[in-house]
């Protein structure tokens, strides 16, 4: 259970709002190239403003050392355009001028403080051992100590960063109630429903290059009997093909180069345990000197070219399985979709997902980008705003932000 914007009277209250508006930026002009995440959090910002709250937005852009690590001035302008409301950029984060700007706010006013990653403590957190990074420890960081006295509530709407434990994401919860924003609320409701109470048949389609993450999801959803079947593609499929005894030549070297050799043994165990619930391609599209050449997969014949997509017979097989599914969760592209010669598998997978009889969920990251490219994003029931956060949630992992939201509910529930 989590606290939401509707649980408290927010008029006249100063609310810190953490969002994820990390966006692609033209490094030459500073222009924002894709405002998807900015649009996603607009409902939360507007709701808070209309409730009469003084809205202080905290956000990050890229990280130190990257070419797109910059101020949030362009983000404030874009937010103003999207909201049709003035969003004032404050050229500071914890300095006196930033604190004075907060004190001078009127009800309903919106300001955006500077990039939180300008503070070293925000990028030095040990994300891998987050359970040791308690709110108490993060509450002792400079940013939290400087800013928390100005806030009555902390709203977290940064689902895309929910698997992180930086001060700006969890530190304020030690001092004030931590609430879900609209994006966070929708993500948690949708993904929890998919994991705990899906309509059946429930089919997961897992692909992409981050095979270890996808295999963790596969294991979790089969172990907990969430999924009735899992369709594999991309590097994930190649690992399961090797586990089944297929000889895929240079593609095995790719698996090794990516550090996924250990995943083959895991795949063998999963095949032994779940059998036909794990579906692998029956043909593949090979990259033969830049051309697409389709070939059926045969246990007795070695593949000698890179596999860059699933073949048409696999597309048909997956379409047949997906058309009657009542819940479909897809994460990761089916192949090298950036190359138009190998886009077809991903496009057909997305079409089959959109045309299924049930509720469709697309994980964030590359597959959501592909859905935009082929014009199918609008046909999905839910496209997650979080790539890594979404897949870790589906894998059954504890996410720092979600844990803190749950603890805040227990501490402050009405």
From Swiss-Prot:
It comes from Methanococcus maripaludis (strain DSM 14266 / JCM 13030 / NBRC 101832 / S2 / LL). Belongs to the phosphoglycerate kinase family. It catalyses: (2R)-3-phosphoglycerate + ATP = (2R)-3-phospho-glyceroyl phosphate + ADP. One of its GO terms (molecular function) is ATP binding. Its EC number is 2.7.2.3. It is an enzyme of class 2 (transferase). This is Phosphoglycerate kinase. Keywords: ATP-binding, Cytoplasm, Glycolysis, Kinase, Nucleotide-binding, Transferase. PANTHER family: PHOSPHOGLYCERATE KINASE (PTHR11406), PHOSPHOGLYCERATE KINASE 1, CHLOROPLASTIC-RELATED (PTHR11406:SF23). Monomer. The lineage of its organism: Archaea, Methanobacteriati, Methanobacteriota, Methanomada group, Methanococci. One of its GO terms (cellular component) is cytosol. SUPFAM superfamilies: Phosphoglycerate kinase. ATP binds at residues 338, 364-367. It comes from the Archaea. It is found in: Cytoplasm. Pathway: Carbohydrate degradation; glycolysis; pyruvate from D-glyceraldehyde 3-phosphate: step 2/5. Gene3D superfamilies: Phosphoglycerate kinase, N-terminal domain. The keyword Kinase applies. Its main location: cytoplasm. GO terms for biological process: gluconeogenesis; glycolytic process. The gene is pgk. The keyword Metal-binding does not apply. Substrate binds at residues 20-22, 37, 60-63, 117, 164. Signal peptide: none annotated.
